[in-house]
From Swiss-Prot:
The organism's taxonomic lineage, starting at the top: Eukaryota, Metazoa, Chordata, Craniata, Vertebrata
Keyword Hydrolase attributed: no
InterPro entries per record: DnaJ_domain, J_dom_sf, P-loop_NTPase, Small_GTP-bd, Small_GTPase
Protein name in the entry: DnaJ homolog subfamily C member 27-B
Localization terms from the record: Nucleus
Species of origin: Xenopus laevis
Function: GTPase possibly involved in regulation of the MEK/ERK pathway.
Length: 276
């Protein structure tokens, strides 16, 4: 058994970690890294060619951390270059642009690509040996925001990922993200390479998360309640009661649950007005 003295000795050793960035082109991956490491913002877009590699040292929880950062190009053209860099990673920064819905919807594809490269033995829904931080970037942008905070937070937290609202341009949220990100990686390393159970507990169920997403994306009141057009009053009320119990804000802590609950109430009211 490892002695307490040995653990203290190991905790004083510099910790070496590998971090990668993932996300579509032009979402701000490189800018986020430069803002944190170099304290500057590069306004002119410069596409990452393949992989950008950098090393930085940080102090977290009285530990010196040597971070090897692999900033991966987001363009599909560079898949053959970046596919070699997924292995032996302790941390992943997933970035999307809040003004580009497609960049948010592509996050699942990025996780699938990572799973493919790590092998079939990896369960992407239970990656407890890697810390993920999701950056909802460009919150300073003047263009219309397509992905609101509750939607991004729900997607992230339902997978046990950290979630942050960031702006590489203004610096908002950047330091907080990296501090929490690195701190979680230190906890992972100190826990034998697995995230502590407390860090994975999300506080809401997959059924709740899936219901909120379905309600958010529904095309009409029928679809929102999950009933077919022409359903009876009893069928509408039954569907409503099930969702109301599942998503009531007093019982559900999932991001977006309050808005989803209100939408369900309004959908029921609208449908019952037209049913005799």
């Amino acid at each position: 058994m490892e002695s307490h003295l040995q653990k203290r000795k190991d905790s004083r050793k510099p910790l070496r970690i590998k971090v990668i960035s993932m996300g579509n082109a032009e979402v701000g991956k490189s800018c986020i890294i430069k803002r944190y490491c170099e304290k500057r913002f590069v306004p002119k877009y410069q596409a990452t060619i393949g992989i950008d590699y950098g090393v930085t040292k940080v102090q977290i929880k009285d530990r010196e951390i040597k971070v090897n950062i692999f900033d991966m190009a987001g363009h599909p053209f560079f898949y053959e270059v970046r596919n070699e860099f997924y292995k032996d990673t302790q941390g992943v920064i997933l970035v999307y642009d809040v003004g580009q819905k497609e960049s948010f919807e592509s996050l699942d594809a990025w996780l699938a690509e990572m799973k493919q490269e790590l092998g079939p033995q990896i369960n992407i829904d239970n990656l407890d040996n890697i810390v993920f931080a999701v950056c909802a970037n460009k919150i300073d942008s003047t263009k219309h925001r397509c992905v609101d905070e509750s939607e991004g937070r729900l997607w992230s937290e339902s997978k046990g990922f950290l979630y942050f609202e960031t702006s590489a341009q203004s610096g908002e949220g950047i330091n907080e993200m990296f501090q929490a990100f690195y701190s979680s990686i230190v906890d992972l390393c100190d826990n034998g390479g697995k995230r502590p159970v407390s860090a994975i507990n999300i506080g809401f169920t997959k059924e709740q998360a899936d219901s909120i997403r379905r309600i958010r994306n529904s095309k009409d009141s029928w679809d929102m309640l999950g009933v077919k057009p022409g359903a009876t009053r009893d069928e509408v009320n039954k569907a409503y009661r099930k969702l109301a119990v599942l998503l009531h804000p007093d019982k559900c802590v999932a991001p977006g649950s309050e808005d989803a609950f209100k939408a369900v109430v309004n959908a029921r009211t609208a449908l019952l007005k037209n049913i005799k």
